[in-house]
A protein has these predicted regions:
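Long, intrinsically disordered, low-complexity accessory segments associated with secretion
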Residues: 1-190
Length: 190
C-alpha cells in the first residue's frame, strides 16, 4: 500500500492564468486545407516562488492546484510536474485543456513562390483560426505559432508579436459565449 503525503501547502498564491493554442511548423511548407476541428486550448498558470507559504526551494515532483468554490470548499483544478525550482523563480504549470474553449483551424491559401534547389524555397500560405468560447465571460487566448525558416507576416487581422526568432504570437480576445477569428498570411523562406 502506498500513501501520499503533502510535502508543503501554500494558500492565496497569486497566479497568472493563460489560455494557449499552440500550432506546429510542419504546415508552412505544404498544402493542407483543414488543420483541426475542435482543437484543444491549454490552460496554464504561472506564479513566483516567493511570499506567503513559498519562497523556499521546491523539489521536483507533482504540484496539485485547488480553487475554492462558492461554498468555500477546495476543488481540484489540475496538476503538473515541476523540476527542482529555486526560491524567487517562476513556476509554470499546465493544468490541462479548457473544456469550454475550442478552435477550428484551416489553411486558406498556399503557393510556392520560388525554389529549385534544396535550400532556396519560398512559400506563402494563409490561415484562419476560429476560436469559440462557451464561457459566460470573455477570455484572452494566446495563439502561438512556431514559424520555420526566415519568415515574414504579410498580412494579419490582428497584430502579432515576435516572441522568439521562430515564434509568432497573437493575443485574441474572444467574447463570452461567442467566437473570434484570426486570419494571417505568412511568407517563409528555407
Amino acid at each position: 500500500q502506498t500513501k501520499q503525503v503533502a510535502l508543503m501547502s501554500a494558500t492565496r498564491v497569486p497566479v497568472k492564468k493563460e489560455f494557449l493554442l499552440e500550432g506546429a511548423n510542419y504546415y508552412y511548407s505544404g498544402q493542407y486545407g483543414e488543420l483541426g476541428q475542435k482543437m484543444k486550448v491549454g490552460v496554464f498558470v504561472e506564479f513566483d516562488n516567493k511570499g506567503e507559504g513559498l519562497g523556499i526551494p521546491l523539489p521536483r515532483g507533482v504540484i496539485r492546484m485547488y480553487k475554492k468554490d462558492s461554498q468555500g470548499n477546495a476543488q481540484f483544478v489540475g496538476e503538473d510536474r515541476i523540476d527542482h525550482t529555486p526560491k524567487n523563480e517562476s513556476v509554470r504549470l499546465k493544468l490541462g485543456d479548457a473544456f469550454d474553449l475550442t478552435a477550428d483551424k484551416k489553411q486558406t491559401a498556399f503557393r510556392k513562390l520560388a525554389g529549385t534547389s534544396r535550400y532556396n524555397y519560398v512559400f506563402e500560405s494563409a490561415y484562419e483560426i476560429v476560436l469559440k468560447n462557451a464561457k459566460p465571460e470573455a477570455v484572452l487566448v494566446t495563439v502561438r505559432e512556431p514559424m520555420p525558416g526566415d519568415w515574414t507576416i504579410v498580412s494579419e487581422s490582428q497584430p502579432h508579436t515576435k516572441a522568439a526568432s521562430g515564434t509568432a504570437e497573437w493575443q485574441v480576445k474572444v467574447p463570452a459565449e461567442g467566437r473570434a477569428t484570426l486570419s494571417y498570411r505568412v511568407r517563409v523562406m528555407y
